[in-house]
Amino acid sequence: MLTIPQVVRAAAEFGDREALVAGDRRWTFRELVHEVERCARSFIALGLAPHDRVAVWAPNSPEWMFAALGAQMVGGVLVPINTRFKGAEAAYVIDRSGATFLFVANGFLDIDYSSEVSGHPAPSLVHVVDVTGPSWNDFVRAGEGVSSSVLAEREGAVRPDDLCDIIFTSGTTGRPKGVMSRHDQTIRVFREWSAIVGLDADDRYLIVNPFFHTFGYKAGFLACLLRGAAMLPLAVFDVPTVLRMVSTERISALPGPPTLYLSILNHPDRHAFDLSSLRLAVTGAAAVPVEMIRRMREELSFDVILTAYGLTESTGTITMCRQDDDPETISSTSGRAIDDIEVRVVDENNVEVPRGTAGEIVCRGYNVMPGYFADPVATADTIDDDGWLHTGDIGVMDTRGYVTITDRLKDMFIVGGFNAYPAEIENALLGHPAVAQVAVVGRLDERMGEVGHAFVVRRTGESVGSDELIEWARTRMANYKVPRGITFVESLPLNASGKVLKFELRERLR
């Protein structure tokens, strides 16, 4: 299997095994494939050409999967959009990608997503479908006249090296960049991922990680399709709901960020639920204390707990721990390279450093993205002439090849599993009339792992308070990007070339 259409067709072989559960709705694998086919036919009927982009701005749901896979079945390129984005942020992704279709879930988080987008330019957009409303039914009926032979022809035209998705990830330039991914690399990486974690057809996987993220999409429902595991997507993370679903649906696989497991361990009603079905946890994105791993095994019944490391540009995966690794290795490292991927740690001159010495983590192999969509300059800045992807992360590799992440060159911090980029937040805050200069850094937070903190220089003669500025920011950016604290300063610390010394700002917060 080298294309997503081939994966979907192979999944039909799981037949009447339960494939998907959402509330009181249930689908077998055969029924799931039928729903995907209906969407694929509708895309053909409505004029989706090969390589056209299809954006989905909605929470985890069966319709998200059906639309995404349906588009990919006929050569469309999926463009997931973060549900926490504001209208301007989403419109930028739609416009930049040239998406012709947009799927939304109006009413989610009390937001009318269609209206949010309509106030911003997105000239490429032709169809907007609300997966919660009548337009969804109209969409799936649109393809009823498309023959099986036409569908088969479009499926067969999808090549392994075609793009399957463009996932926009924010960057240090302050504007999201579209990371391109091919069918073949996506399938190969997550076939490997699934084998390492031991996901199988007897598993029932509660997908709490959002589908707009590689963790929920590729390490989520795509991995389940590859292995025949049942999928139970969750639109919003809520500990009581997770506990109830684990108990009633006999969930065995529960990957997620460390905050997920801490929230469960610390919930006062945890002991009222039968969690004995749990067996598989995969985590990363933040430090994992060895004590937490011990408690997950002893108190939550997990047999397999693995940590991993990767970025969107590496198809989500570079290194992974293995099932026979000891708790200290799982806690203190992000594992070793997956098969047939090269990983090195290099200095500022791109020379490999000795084991145990800190440097930038670089990788090379089939997992490396083809590049950023319509951005050759950014691509050349990230992938060197020898094909090495420069992650921007600082780490140390031990004698076994296991990697420990120690810092981030790009100043990114991770808020509850979501990547937050200071430059993007700073650019937004500079839009406030009272803000002259701003620098954002991450600080430790017991619940979220890290949160943002802004150091702000006010404009002369202008006045704004912390609460006012934070509330202003909430209306203009995703909640995880909003600084949790603000310190007003007379000036920012700068080096000789005028660059903000962010390490000094971090020291002030210690």
Spans of features found by a protein language model:
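Conserved pre-ATP/AMP-binding loop-to-beta segment of ANL
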Residues: 16, 129-134, 144-168, 175, ...
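Gly/Ser/Thr-rich phosphate-binding loop
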Residues: 251-256, 267-329, 342
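Conserved ATP/PPi-binding loop(s) of AMP-dependent carboxylate-activating enzymes
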Residues: 336-340, 351-382, 418-420
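AMP-binding/adenylate-forming catalytic core of the ANL superfamily
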Residues: 85-91, 102-104, 254, 365, ...
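Conserved AMP-binding A3 loop
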Residues: 28-30, 161-188
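Conserved AMP-binding/adenylation subdomain of ANL enzymes
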Residues: 75, 187-204, 212-253, 267
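Conserved AMP-binding/adenylate-forming core of the ANL superfamily
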Residues: 16-69, 86-91, 137-144, 157, ...
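Structural core segment of the AMP-binding/adenylate-forming
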Residues: 45-46, 73-141, 460-462
